[in-house]
UniProtKB/Swiss-Prot annotation:
GO terms for cellular component: cytosol. It comes from Enterococcus hirae (strain ATCC 9790 / DSM 20160 / JCM 8729 / LMG 6399 / NBRC 3181 / NCIMB 6459 / NCDO 1258 / NCTC 12367 / WDCM 00089 / R). The lineage of its organism: Bacteria, Bacillati, Bacillota, Bacilli, Lactobacillales. SMART domains: AAA. The gene is recA. Pfam families: RecA (PF00154), RecA_C (PF21096). This is Protein RecA.
Length: 346
C-alpha cells in the first residue's frame, strides 16, 4: 500500500513538473538556498539593524514616515549602492519631486538611472511590473504610494468620493508584482507617507495610505523619523534620524539605526561609523575627546567626524574593524520559519 502511495505521488510530481516546469514543486530541504542574497543599504548602521547586511533581493520593502524625515534619501542611497555594484536601478517618481542634483550628491549615477513620472497610479504600477518582469533591473523605487492616484480619481471631479480605490489598486498590483519580484530577484522599495485617523482616543492614530496589502506583502518595513536637529554654531546643518525596523521576515525586527542626515549630503558615513566604533571600543571616547590607537582625533563629535572625513585611510581601517565586529559581509542564514518563503530554483 505504501509503495502504491509513493508511486502515485511520484506520478503526480512528474505531471506537475511537466505542466509547470522543473522546480515548480520539490521537498523543502532538497535544493533550497538558505543564504540571504543582499545589497548594502548605503548605511552601515542600517545594514546592522536589518540583520542580514542590507536589503534582501527578491523582496518588497516599505519605507514610511512623516514629511521631510529622510525616506527618499534612504531609497536613493540604496540605488547608489546598486549602481556601484554594476546593477540597474529605476525610480518611479509619482510625486514628481525628484531632485537630480541631490541624487547625484548621494552617489546616484543620474545618467544611468531609469526615471518615470507617471500620470496615474495604474500607469506607474504597470511600468514597475514591466521593469520587474524584464529581469534586467536590480532595484525599483516607487515614490510614493500615496501619490499613486487611481485613473478614476483623476478623470472625476474634485469633490467626488472614491472609497477604497487606491487600496484595491495596490492590492491587485502587489498580487501581480510579488511573484515576479521574487523570481527575478528584484528589490522593490515602496516609499509611503502617513495619515492620521480621525477620532482615535487611545493608541497610535497614524496609518499609511494604500490599504493593508503592502503591510502584508512587505518583507521589511522601515519607519523613518527625525529625532533632533544638528547644528554647527547657529546654523542647522542636518537631522539626527532614527530608522526603526518595524517588520522583518529575514531577521529579528524592532532594531533601530540612528544616523545623521546632512542637508545636501545625505547620510553621514563618518557619523555612523564613529558611533559604531565607540560602541565596540574600537574608538575610545573619554569625556568630549575621541581617540584611535591612543591618538586623539577630535574634541567633540563634529570635530572627530571632520577628522575622519579628511583621513580616508584611517576611516577605511576603522570601517574594516567595525564590519568585522558586527559581522557585516559574512553569509547570514535565514531563520527556519522564513525558509518556506524563499523562491525555488532549478
Amino acid at each position: 500500500m505504501a509503495d502504491d502511495r509513493k508511486a502515485a505521488l511520484d506520478a503526480a510530481l512528474k505531471k506537475i513538473e511537466k505542466n509547470y516546469g522543473k522546480g515548480s514543486i520539490m521537498k523543502l530541504g532538497e535544493k533550497i538556498d538558505q543564504q540571504v542574497s543582499t545589497i548594502p543599504s548605503g548605511s552601515l548602521a542600517l545594514d546592522v539593524a536589518l540583520g542580514v547586511g542590507g536589503y534582501p533581493r527578491g523582496r518588497i520593502i516599505e519605507v514610511y514616515g512623516p514629511e521631510s524625515s529622510g525616506k527618499t534619501t534612504v531609497a536613493l542611497h540604496a540605488i547608489a549602492e546598486v549602481q556601484k555594484n554594476g546593477g540597474t536601478a529605476a525610480f518611479i517618481d509619482a510625486e514628481h519631486a525628484l531632485d537630480p542634483q541631490y541624487a547625484q550628491k548621494l552617489g546616484v549615477n543620474i545618467d544611468e538611472l531609469l526615471l518615470s513620472q507617471p500620470d496615474t497610479g495604474e500607469q506607474g504600477l504597470e511600468i514597475a511590473d514591466a521593469l520587474v518582469s524584464s529581469g534586467a533591473v536590480d532595484i525599483v523605487v516607487v515614490d510614493s504610494v500615496a501619490a499613486l492616484v487611481p485613473r478614476a480619481e483623476i478623470d472625476g471631479e474634485m469633490g467626488d468620493s472614491h472609497v477604497g480605490l487606491q487600496a484595491r489598486l495596490m492590492s491587485q498590483a502587489l498580487r501581480k508584482l510579488s511573484g515576479s519580484i521574487n523570481k527575478t530577484k528584484t528589490i522593490a522599495i515602496f516609499i509611503n507617507q502617513i495619515r492620521e485617523k480621525v477620532g482615535v482616543m487611545f493608541g497610535n492614530p497614524e496609518i499609511t495610505p494604500g490599504g493593508r496589502a503592502l503591510k502584508f506583502y512587505a518583507t521589511i518595513r522601515l519607519e523613518v523619523r527625525r529625532a533632533e536637529q544638528l547644528k554647527q554654531g547657529t546654523d542647522i546643518v542636518g537631522n539626527r534620524t532614527k530608522i526603526k525596523v518595524v517588520k522583518n521576515k529575514v531577521a529579528p525586527p524592532f532594531k533601530i539605526a540612528e544616523v545623521d542626515v546632512m542637508y545636501g549630503q545625505g547620510i553621514s558615513q563618518e557619523g555612523e561609523l564613529l558611533d559604531m566604533a565607540v560602541e565596540k571600543d574600537i574608538v575610545d571616547k573619554s569625556g568630549a575627546w575621541y581617540s584611535y590607537k591612543e591618538d586623539r582625533i577630535g574634541q567633540g563629535r563634529e570635530n572627530a567626524k571632520n577628522y575622519m572625513s579628511t583621513h580616508p585611510e584611517m576611516m577605511a581601517e576603522v570601517s574594516a574593524l567595525v564590519r568585522a565586529a558586527y559581522g557585516i559581509g559574512e553569509d547570514v542564514e535565514i531563520p527556519e520559519e522564513t525558509q518556506a518563503e524563499l523562491p525555488l530554483e532549478e
